[in-house]
Amino acid sequence: MWLVLAFTSAALLGFYDVFKKQALKGNDVVAVLTLNTFFSSLIFLPLVILSATGALSPDSIFYVPSCGWEVHKYVILKAVIVLASWLCGYFALKQLPLTIVGPINATRPVMVLLGAIFVFGERLNLWQWTGVLCAIVGFYFLSRSGKREGIDFRHNRWIVLAVMASAFGAVSALYDKFLLAPAESGGVGLNRMVVQSYFMFYQFLMMIPVLLIMKWNGNEKDERKDIGVVERKKASFLSHSSLFSSSMFSFRLSIPLVSLFLCAADFVYFYALTLPGALIAVVSMIRRGSVLVSFCIGALAFHEKNLRYKAVDLALVLLSMVFLYLGSR
């Protein structure tokens, strides 16, 4: 059952990536991310209220138990890790082709596996080491494909941010295992709905000061530029400039769709991890299979280039996941 849920989460995550690329295209990154966390919070807010008032039964899969600081401190750290991944990933995805970012994200299971070695003391078998090697080779060939589009993996800051996003995502996956695992297994034993609901709320609260700071920074730049020329026009609340983006903000239907598909994908993901026998490495690997959806739809929707070369690179990354699966059986 958990395997079926993992594949479902992967499909939802693929559409999430496509909508995210559409939402970010020529748009303000910080404003889009702030609204994504806002809409995600709105999705879970009714569940928290219904659970607190007793309208939802504790036996419901949507029930959110009440909890204190001892639980919330773990969720806040989860929110920080995920938000760091999203900030890096959003900036990278706006500037890079989806057919480049997708395969980079697909290497995340390898990072999770390597992290499991150092954090949980796990040992890799021959199949898993073969998978790691395939991922490294695939990443190398992906860098060569990027050069055909003028993207130098060694000196491109957006590539660095994409890799950092994947690294933070791998840390988040390992932290999920720690949070959801029962105490007798060395984990915290948190309820999955508590984690998913409240980390969305905390992310939105964290994004508010980020948005205000970036708005103030952008307005300050506008004032310096316009002194002695013309009076600066009153800026819209969400039309600021930033270090990475000077785009104006425009609301699109794809923005709430990002939140909807993300929440659905994460709900299925967290539920899968709570089922008996669920393996975090395998679930994480299957979720990265979302790259097939985002790669195919992204290639058609955004008319991206060098697809033949990138398809070979992607095949190597997917082959690495097959080896990881064989090694995890």
Regions found by a protein language model. Name each.
Residues 41-70, 118, 140-150, 204-251, ...:
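Membrane-interface helix-cap regions at the ends of transmembrane helices
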Residues 39-43, 104-118, 202-206, 265, ...:
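Alpha-helical transmembrane segments of compact multi-pass small-molecule transporters, enriched
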Residues 1-7, 11, 110-172, 177, ...:
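Juxtamembrane helix-loop boundary signature in multi-pass membrane transporters
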Residues 23, 32, 92, 118-124, ...:
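Hydrophobic/aromatic residues within transmembrane alpha-helices
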Residues 2-5, 30-52, 160-164, 168, ...:
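Hydrophobic alpha-helical transmembrane segments of multi-pass integral membrane proteins
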Residues 14, 45, 79, 83, ...:
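Hydrophobic/small/kink-forming positions within alpha-helical transmembrane segments
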Residues 25-32, 87-104, 184-193, 267-288:
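Structural motif at transmembrane-helix junctions in multi-pass transporters
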Residues 2-8, 56-88, 105, 157-167, ...:
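Loop-to-transmembrane-helix transition segments
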